[in-house]
Every structure is written in structure tokens, then in C-alpha cells.
Amino acid sequence: MCGNTMSVPLLTDAATVSGAERETAAVIFLHGLGDTGHSWADALSTIRLPHVKYICPHAPRIPVTLNMKMVMPSWFDLMGLSPDAPEDEAGIKKAAENIKALIEHEMKNGIPANRIVLGGFSQGGALSLYTALTCPHPLAGIVALSCWLPLHRAFPQAANGSAKDLAILQCHGELDPMVPVRFGALTAEKLRSVVTPARVQFKTYPGVMHSSCPQEMAAVKEFLEKLLPPV
């Protein structure tokens, strides 16, 4: 990893997948509640593009209200998983700032904002949506898997002006018992009020629960190939 990572705590021990060629683009992917970046680094290595660097940071360990205050990797506190559940606004905003610092570190190392995709699964996907929509830098797009938009009532007003050009791939399992697919559909509807509607893809997968599947990973690869072509 080139550059000073000490000022970006999430980078110091992040799981990374290096490109086989000169890296001209980056995907920052955020794991779900209770997980680490390693599992998604492994998954993304199966669809890697040779000129893309994949960065999968680990969330800090904090008490999570939803899980009886058990301490576990979590980007912010979770009180519930429904559109009207109370939210940890301060924690969400702080986590987003930490991800923006990671984005800016990559930019300083020569990867322009429009060659950076932010993505994530479940809570990580939620944070990637919030961060990208409020980011002052015009990113290439978002990969949002099995997730929702945090603080959704603040949008579209809370979005940065450059957010309207973001490309978004949103995927959801139709049998998801944790984050119901209906919540995903409401999120897609809200996203179309924030970005150019035609730039939001919402794909659902029959028989899939709160997890990924090969068809979804193929869709992610196709999305990244179009958004981050070789230069």
C-alpha cells in the first residue's frame, strides 16, 4: 500500500486484493454486521478485474442495540431493521466521514474519484449508499447488496449535487428475512428521487435469503466492467 496509511485508520489492516496490472481504479467494499473485510475480499477476488484494486476495511467493534448490546464489528449502532426504526444518526455520519477519508486517500494516491466505486453488503451497503450520496467528490457508482438507505427521510435534500450522476447497482434476495425485499424496493424508489432514475438498477433473486449468490456476483462484475473500463 503506497502512501501514509496512519492517518486513515481503516486502511491500516484492511483486506485488499491487488490488481494484476497497473491499478487505475478502486472498489471500496464494506462488510455487513458481525463480519470482517476478509470474506468480501475473497468473494471479490473471484470476479477481479486486472486494473482494479479492491479494499475491504474492517468495521470497529462496538455494542449493538439490536443484538442485546453484544460487542461485534459494526459500522454504526443498529436499533432495528425496518423503515421506521430509530437510527444512530451520529454514528452513521461519523462512519461516513471515515469512509470519505479512505476515498480521499486513494485520490491522493492517483486514483480519481470518477474511477472509485463504493459498495457493501447489508449494513455495509447501507453505509456505502449514505456515504456516496453525501460525498463531495463525484464517485463512479455504488454496489448496494441486501441493504437500505440510512436516514432516508433526509434525502434528496441531504445529497451532494454531484450525486445525481452516480450509477447504482442494487441487488436483493427475494426471501431475505433480515432486510425484507420490500425495504429494498422502497430504497430503490427513494434512490430514483436522488440520482438520475435510469442510473438505478434494482435486481432481485428468487430463493435467495440474506446472502449473495453467483448470479448476483456476475451482475456486480458486469456493472464494474462497464463503469471502470481499462484506461
Curated annotation (Swiss-Prot):
State any single GO MF term: carboxylic ester hydrolase activity
Tissue specificity as recorded in UniProt: Expressed in various breast cancer cell lines.
Which UniProt keywords are listed?
Answer: Cytoplasm, Fatty acid metabolism, Hydrolase, Lipid metabolism, Lipoprotein, Palmitate, Phosphoprotein
EC top class named in words: hydrolase
Q: Which Pfam families match?
A: Abhydrolase_2
Means of activity regulation:
Inhibited by compound 1 or (5,5-Dioxido-4H-thieno[3,2-c]thiochromen-2-yl)(4-(4-methoxyphenyl)piperazin-1-yl)methanone.
Q: Report what the protein is called.
A: Acyl-protein thioesterase 2
Instruction: Name its species.
Output: Homo sapiens (Human)
Gene symbol? LYPLA2
